[in-house]
Design a protein with these regions (language model features):
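A conserved catalytic-core segment of Leloir-type glycosyltransferases
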Residues: 28, 32-133
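Histidine-centered beta-alpha loop that forms part of the nucleotide-sugar donor binding/catalytic region
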Residues: 8, 42, 167-170
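A short, glycine/small-residue-rich beta-strand->loop->alpha-helix junction that serves as a flexible
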Residues: 9-21
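Active-site proximal beta-strand in glycosyltransferases
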Residues: 3, 140-142, 149, 153-174, ...
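Membrane-proximal helix-turn-helix segments that form the acceptor-binding/catalytic region
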Residues: 130-135, 157, 180-196
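Short amphipathic alpha-helix
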Residues: 19-30
Length: 203
């Protein structure tokens, strides 16, 4: 089985609990010997442990076609990806995203953190999910927490594959009752579109 996972953090770059949780889950799934995992991360730094997982960087996935040669791709992205993967992803651009701000590689910039424009990054991440879902082969989609639910939904719409969302916490838990209606609606939409919902407790 092959799983396409969407997550916002991956060690050693940890900003909260999602990184260690995602790492542990992926490690456990891969250790069964029955599943390979492709993990889509907003902005890999190149020093992530990836001996047991295939990491794709959203920041390294083109959404606007650029005519760049192999050596330039190697120079820009060789620290975290094989240049051929850039071209494979570029071949699966599915719409005209030229209205978006992209860099010289045709890629959207991501902070790799939780910036003030987090909702914009979440939306852009879901655009990337459409390219990745058209490029990769997988049997199931796994989205870690609300930040990645829109990406998981988009990948499901593109591929028709089942979506499993992993609820690490809800905004009710994080906000102590002062729920952000935008976050709540993203969480609800994720749950409404999921084929499977996993959570960290039975409460």
């Amino acid at each position: 089985m092959k799983a396409l996972m969407f997550g916002w953090e991956w060690p050693p770059h940890i900003l909260g609990g999602l990184g260690p949780a995602s790492y542990g889950i992926v490690r456990g799934v891969v250790n069964t010997g029955e599943c390979d995992v492709t993990f889509v991360l907003p902005k890999p730094q190149g020093d992530e442990e990836k001996g047991f997982v295939h990491i794709i960087g959203a920041a390294n996935t083109p959404v606007v076609w650029r005519d760049v040669d192999w050596n330039y791709v190697q120079q820009r992205f060789g620290y975290c990806m094989d240049p051929q993967e850039y071209y494979d992803l570029r071949n699966c651009i599915y719409a005209d995203f030229s209205h978006l701000y992209t860099n010289d590689m045709g890629c959207i910039e991501f902070s790799g953190r939780y910036p003030k424009n987090l909702l914009e990054e979440i939306n852009n991440y879901s655009i990337i999910a459409g390219v990745v879902a058209r490029t990769e082969e997988f049997d199931i989609i796994h989205a870690h927490d609300w930040l990645t639910f829109p990406a998981g939904i988009h990948a499901k719409q593109v591929s028709g594959k089942p979506l499993c969302i992993h609820v690490h916490a809800t905004d009710f838990d994080r906000s102590r009752g002062k729920v952000n209606p935008t976050v709540y609606s993203i969480e609800k939409n994720g749950m409404d579109n999921a084929d499977c919902i996993m959570c960290v407790s039975e409460l």
